[in-house]
């Protein structure tokens, strides 16, 4: 009778600790000797290679299971330790347990009432599927504070932990070392029922098991030895470490038995602890690593598990598979985008299993006759036969020269042959790192000679645009030197959040080659942007060129202050020392080092942290508290939960973590001025930061400690003299906690006064400066503050208070320019209110101009919110005008956040190839599916043509690049002879007959390149758009364009215009996008295959070369450039002379040196731009390099001007280069030389060549970008691995829901709307405009 394995489903996994008894039970041998092999080379009994632990040598048999090498899985042994040792992996856990339990009775030091309450919580969490560990953390926290045991009444002394494994008992001022035996003794006392409170299951994890008395010895198969060429054996690192442990353990045992002095025993015990520590983790902090004699650190247990080379990432997450190949890649334009060229040598090695049937038997016979050496052939034949035991078995036979003919004659139906890879087979093609699904796609094989894999190759705003940072605005052109250090406000589904930037562009608008539009909304809000710059509207993302009057764009209304460059120091080391001395504090150096490590001293206004600290100070002077003394300094923050989370994020930026947010409920009795008493009930949330360094810093920044009602103080001087945006941060945070919420009056169209109160005791009331300072500061924002005085309360300490009641009446100015921070609900209302008041102001102005009837009622605020407001402060405004305009430069930024948007002039706007491979030595992987199911799945889901459109935005991610684009431009802008036209058409796989010539020149019939290209287009395609070569004329002439830049396609025929990147380039290709959307992916693939091959043939016929002479400039151009650069250097000399004489005019907020640098940088930047403009003027459109730039094939005009004219100033961290030798950067310059050339100005061009000093400066500037890129790559890679681990089991079910592997619902509809982004139209489910255009073109409108 046959036996079948019963499949089992894993219900749960329980992790535990190995008990000493269990270690002994699973052990097959007690290991007692450090020796491994005897003189004859056989394993020693009781040694680390004992054959009871398994065998690794051929010929030996395992004494435990009788298996040989490959059969025996290996067995554990054990070492009896002479003294207990701490398991380093549990050192911190042991410390937490020791602090939580009573050393006398072993009970957890919490009362019975609290114990019952916690057990009930745990039962509830277990029942509801919650996280019990948070409750356990609460137990540890509560119990560690107790000093008298509530169970036995004994004193519970404190425990000190010193890494890696040392514990001390604190008894008064004395410290007594706890040995591992002492620790184990305490842990043994803990009853089972208390283990549950500590998060341990006593059945599988008793706490004393964390202190080792028996050490398991892993099987020999886990740590095999190797035989070197010399014949000597080399042991595994784990064996080396175990030898050290046994040797020291034996010595310790002998000394204990021999009655050696305690000092020697302690030394040997510590040494045993060290060897056990490094056996578990040889990279633990505070322990010198164990090393080989060669100096190489040993690779022990922890190192085998963690990191890139560890078990998890290397062996589990990263698989090594059969039927795969890897080699260098190279391009082949003759292949289809669905094809991959495979070297013949690879095709002969990789095989595809194919079953023999009556339909393919003759073909397989021929393959068998070819054998395994000739392609296409067969490597193996598999035949099922009845074995001697009567069961069906598979026999695999290798095909050789001697047996190939035999098998060709005797092959039969039902056999399986493993044949060579052949043309048309489906394979998977992958490039690492595999960051998105297009990193591995299915291709069809084309077997080719040679040894490489081959495959087909196949946005901005005006400089004065303001970008919203965290509560301040900055012009985008001013970000050029600061973009790496700032964070911009971005929107994640209309949830504002801050993000850093990954890129910044400044481009010459003419070189960028896009139309530029000025957009104006109904409230007069304006922005200038290029036609491709994306805007967020109520109908999804639209490019600027697609916007129409009446479209509603998304706005974040504000009138926040502008960023001002100010390098003044706010607080430094001396100021911190003074504060520490004033309070009689200790640990001065420790506090200063903490602040330096967090880069909080010295602190300047320009530092991002200055804005955060202004907010923190504002909150602490409002609802917060600062308690500062030698023993228990802390800062308390109060507010709603969401607002406290925002404060926590800010604190994290400063390097501090707050404690848990707690709910406080209670009531208090208040006595008013007349003696009348009232009971006030309330609740609120708060959290604390118990870090003395933060408390000292806030004190140095002017925060008031203790009871603010009894103290006289004003706004800190650093805030009063700060740039306006810092003042705004302070005020908005203070008002976030103190000012009333915006409320509308009963008639619904005007707001109630905004007010706040400040109470002071009578004795200091008239002398307090705080309210006066606020009044003065608000005047700078155009806001008037009215103050009145009211009687206060009678305090419990006997003091009477008076109250300032301050009211704000300039609502529009307050909402627009200041608003609320750390008060999200108030801030959202403030944004809506600001937009509402602007709308009302416009309405009143229009009414006066147009003399509307006075009885026309203005919309109420509530109705305005419903009609105009979105969420979190975002609103919508209608576009009232769109005009073409011109600017010199355009700019763009890219956010690190996946949101890829930012707020420009109040508008919510977006940031301006699948394998991402180049051919400079990149390698790729190829995998051969081994079953029909796998091949069908790859063909249906993974074929390249199915991935032309990006799953990110629905546009084409695959498209033409480089020569394909240049070729398409040459093809569609020229005429060709009959032979040439025929050759181009045949290259594209088009077999149509030639039409009548389009024109005759000198008796030679010529055929239009436009008509040739049209043969690749599907019938029924109708499209109009502007090519990339468009000159951005003031008035578009459309079909009459003299530059042939307006493309018109009717019924699949190119009537007007040339084809460039905008036609079929990657991401931008409108033709390709339209074909895939309207005719399907296969039509898109056919078009791309045909059009690219014809383009390449056109390049070959016409000739298209670029070289160093393309950057040649005439002598007059070079003289003009030299003159500009000479004048710039003279200006720099004048600036330096003025600086040295002390006559240089200071720039606002800058000292003398900073002003000098700002003037010099400005002069040199202008010089580079002027030199570029001269070069551009002399490079014409007949230049091949220029053609590549304007068609979008490669690079841009800016690259060409740098090659031909001048590189300009090289910078490090946004400034001229100053780091180098003392007094000078390089020894080639005089000490103290401040000139342009001595600090990184490169006046040469790439064409001319750089001098040695210029080359060095250029390398310094380039290195910064390389380091920055490397750091960001590592961070994004780590983030992606974590996301993959978290989300790997999510899938979309057939009912449209998203669920995890347990069937738990994550989303009711994929993406909440059920739309596949790949099938959307650049973010929109349906493109209405495209449908209208199609109808118009169909009926010739």
Swiss-Prot record:
Top-rank taxon, per record: Archaea
Post-translational modification: This protein undergoes a protein self splicing that involves a post-translational excision of the intervening region (intein) followed by peptide ligation.
Gene Ontology annotations for the cellular component aspect, listed alphabetically: cytoplasm; DNA-directed RNA polymerase complex
Xref: PROSITE patterns: INTEIN_C_TER, INTEIN_ENDONUCLEASE, INTEIN_N_TER
Entry keywords, A to Z: Autocatalytic cleavage, Cytoplasm, DNA-binding, DNA-directed RNA polymerase, Magnesium, Metal-binding, Nucleotidyltransferase, Protein splicing, Transcription, Transferase, Zinc
Free-text cofactor note: Binds at least 2 Zn(2+) per subunit.
UniProt entry tagged with the keyword Transferase: yes
Reaction equation(s) it catalyzes: RNA(n) + a ribonucleoside 5'-triphosphate = RNA(n+1) + diphosphate
Molecular function in Gene Ontology: DNA binding; DNA-directed RNA polymerase activity; endonuclease activity; magnesium ion binding; zinc ion binding
Subcellular location: Cytoplasm
Subunit structure: Part of the RNA polymerase complex.
PANTHER family with a match to the protein in the record: DNA-DIRECTED RNA POLYMERASE (PTHR19376), DNA-DIRECTED RNA POLYMERASE III SUBUNIT RPC1 (PTHR19376:SF32)
Protein name stated in the entry: DNA-directed RNA polymerase subunit Rpo1N
Source organism of this protein record: Methanocaldococcus jannaschii (strain ATCC 43067 / DSM 2661 / JAL-1 / JCM 10045 / NBRC 100440)
